[in-house]
Amino acid sequence: MPPGVAVCFSSLFIRLVCMAFLTSSDKALWHLALPMIFSNITVPLLGLVDTAVIGHLDSPVYLGGVAVGATATSFLFMLLLFLRMSTTGLTAQAYGAKNPQALARTLVQPLLLALGAGALIALLRTPIIDLALHIVGGSEAVLEQARRFLEIRWLSAPASLANLVLLGWLLGVQYARAPVILLVVGNILNIVLDVWLVMGLHMNVQGAALATVIAEYATLLIGLLMVRKILKLRGISGEMLKTAWRGNFRRLLALNRDIMLRSLLLQLCFGAITVLGARLGSDIIAVNAVLMTLLTFTAYALDGFAYAVEAHSGQAYGARDGSQLLDVWRAACRQSGIVALLFSVVYLLAGEHIIALLTSLTQIQQLADRYLIWQVILPVVGVWCYLLDGMFIGATRATEMRNSMAVAAAGFALTLLTLPWLGNHALWLALTVFLALRGLSLAAIWRRHWRNGTWFAAT
């Protein structure tokens, strides 16, 4: 073939590939997903810094304590993740329906819930911590470090939960810049304070907790300033905000109930990994903390696509536009599938080097290498359930999300029966089964709705 013809065919092939993988829907998805990916990865980046900073102290007890404390915090706060999820779905639907009064309601009502729940957690933190550490069990030295971490960390509860609402609302109105500023500035501040308080002032686990508390309240202030700006842009008046606490509160509570039950099952499964890992020894819990940081980093990055799907799915639901919904879904599958595969390749080729950066403890590095294969498998298994979560959140189909999570949790529990034979591998196998079942069950429900034409039916 003459060189000129070869170049022509190559150029045509590249254009066809770009047309297939970068349609207008793909570009619209990336417009919202890309800033969310970059802002999202600052969240696990904070976890990476926590792990790296604490992991370079002179004992694995500190790392284990932060792992237990972070898991308890995640379990409790993520039970209230419905504050962000329901806010995003309802806000996106109001945005699609072009209803400013509904937009005001989807901000004020969940914000009141968040501040009330956060205040209760801060006031009652000591008995809740006692209960959490009693359930976890394990090394007394690790539990003591976890207690020191949590006594300070949970003072941030009102701000942390309010920030979930602000993030959900900003995402729902598709103002991509605001969530980026909210997450990036807050988490960078957290990272800087983390290094200074832990390494500079030698505050150990208390320093890591205090850094997060300061950063959460700073983020809340920034978020409120951003929301104030966007209220003006969206034509939402002060009178609308004053009356926004009224009306449809029962629907919000019912929606949040189902999402909270879903979140409870999710956190029970992830909490089981820490609890059962702690009973396998201090080294195992430290190893799993390092590996879970990698998984969290991947999940948050891929959640950038899920967040974009939430916003577009909710907008399409509010406008009753099935064509837009299907275009966004196909674009999300293409783009997030490629990114998930890239994560798997990176962990396959450079996983050992990444672990070495996170901890200088040789025994932890060597032990972590045995379980690295799960970090290669999990991105390509988990990406589909993240995307489908976005579809269902946007449509506020919380009951079906709850039922899907129940199926996945049952599969997780059954897989744990292999623990006496597989040891720590059983924990990671159970997590893989859990993510796979979430994706498969949601896909089956989505397929049924699409065939029957019932996706846009009232929820």
UniProtKB/Swiss-Prot annotation:
Induction per the UniProt record: By DNA damage.
Stored InterPro entries: DinF-like (IPR044644), MATE_fam (IPR002528)
Family per similarity comment: Belongs to the multi antimicrobial extrusion (MATE) (TC 2.A.66.1) family.
Pfam family, one: MatE
Name the record gives this protein: DNA damage-inducible protein F
UniProt entry keywords in alphabetical sequence: Cell inner membrane, Cell membrane, Membrane, Transmembrane, Transmembrane helix
Localization per Swiss-Prot or TrEMBL: Cell inner membrane
Primary residence: membrane
Topological relation to the membrane, as annotated: Multi-pass membrane protein
Species name: Escherichia coli (strain K12)
The UniProt record lists the keyword Glycosyltransferase: no
PANTHER family: PROTEIN DETOXIFICATION 44, CHLOROPLASTIC, PROTEIN DETOXIFICATION 44, CHLOROPLASTIC-RELATED
Keyword Ubl conjugation attributed: no
TM regions (residue ranges): 2-22, 29-49, 63-83, 111-131, 154-174, 180-200, 207-227, 265-285, 289-309, 338-358, 373-393, 416-436
GO molecular function, one term: xenobiotic transmembrane transporter activity
Superkingdom of this protein's organism: Bacteria
CDD domains per UniProt: MATE_DinF_like
GO CC annotations, alphabetized: plasma membrane
